[in-house]
């Protein structure tokens, strides 16, 4: 059986998060001196380290079987690949921005204007839908400086926090699309590689299911069990086990981080003691 070939960005935040996810799936990938190809000794997986904008092409051509890449690159390259999993990290948006001192009246403002971008395909589709006639200035980097040096009237680029726009005296005026890290797959995988992919997706799901959840254990008087259970969500229902001390039980459940802080005072008011909150590495549903 051949290895499943996974394309990953060769450096940067997306690369770090991708390798972190694979590691949380208990798959360790060794890296060669040139960091072009990596192998796993405990799972039939081979990693190809590529430029992120090359990943859709490599996956579409079958050089890589799957890839972890920003959705923005998938939309821009528009290759024959299928998004099979959204990963929830490396979130950003693709937006139009203009100088802060301009009084923006709506998307029609871009008629007859010049827009600098590294994502011409996505922008062209958006402008066509909006019936906007603008000139595109395609550049490969430092898009945000284009208005300041007179290259363009506005820009279309990735926005995360928006701090880069502010530092270049720009303001975001139109959000065209959202993006996050996704897993894409080549069409027509062999049955053998599909089986490996299914196993990998199962591991990834168990890791993703655990995110933001905690295992909670507490001791409570039996008279308060029904009240406590009513505010503990659990996966099906909380586990209740009698303690050696008469009239007391131990209650176990799974709770989301944000929910715990909303109910902890109620738990204490109902007599809960010895509350333990434990991280969950993996959760199979």
Language-model features, listed with the residues they occupy:
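Short, structured active-site "lid" loops
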Residues: 46-63
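Small-molecule-sensing regulatory modules
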Residues: 2-44, 69-82, 87-93, 101-285
């Amino acid at each position: 059986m051949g290895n499943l070939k996974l394309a990953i960005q060769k450096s940067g935040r997306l690369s770090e998060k991708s390798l972190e996810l694979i590691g949380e799936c208990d798959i360790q990938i060794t890296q060669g001196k040139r960091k072009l190809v990596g192998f796993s000794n405990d799972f039939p997986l081979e990693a190809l380290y590529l430029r992120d904008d090359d990943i859709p092409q490599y996956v579409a051509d079958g050089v890589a079987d799957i890839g972890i890449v920003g959705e923005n690159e998938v939309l821009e390259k528009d290759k024959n690949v299928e998004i099979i999993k959204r990963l929830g990290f490396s979130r950003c948006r693709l937006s139009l921005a203009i100088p802060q001192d301009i009084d923006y009246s709506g998307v029609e403002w871009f008629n007859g204007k010049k827009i600098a971008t590294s994502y011409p395909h996505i922008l062209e589709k958006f402008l066509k839908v909006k019936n906007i006639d603008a000139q595109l200035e395609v550049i490969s980097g430092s898009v945000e400086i284009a208005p300041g040096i007179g290259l363009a009237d506005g820009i279309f680029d990735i926005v995360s926090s928006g701090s880069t726009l502010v530092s270049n005296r720009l303001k975001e005026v139109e959000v065209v699309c959202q993006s996050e890290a996704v897993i894409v797959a080549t069409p027509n995988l062999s049955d053998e590689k599909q089986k490996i992919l299914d196993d990998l997706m199962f591991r990834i799901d168990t890791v993703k299911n655990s995110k933001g959840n905690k295992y909670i254990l507490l001791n409570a008087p039996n008279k308060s069990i029904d009240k406590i259970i009513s505010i503990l969500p659990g996966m099906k229902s909380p586990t209740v086990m009698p303690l050696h001390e008469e009239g007391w039980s131990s209650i176990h459940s799974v709770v989301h981080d944000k929910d715990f802080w909303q109910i902890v005072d109620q738990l204490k008011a109902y007599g809960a003691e010895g509350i333990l909150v434990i991280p969950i590495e993996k959760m199979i549903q």
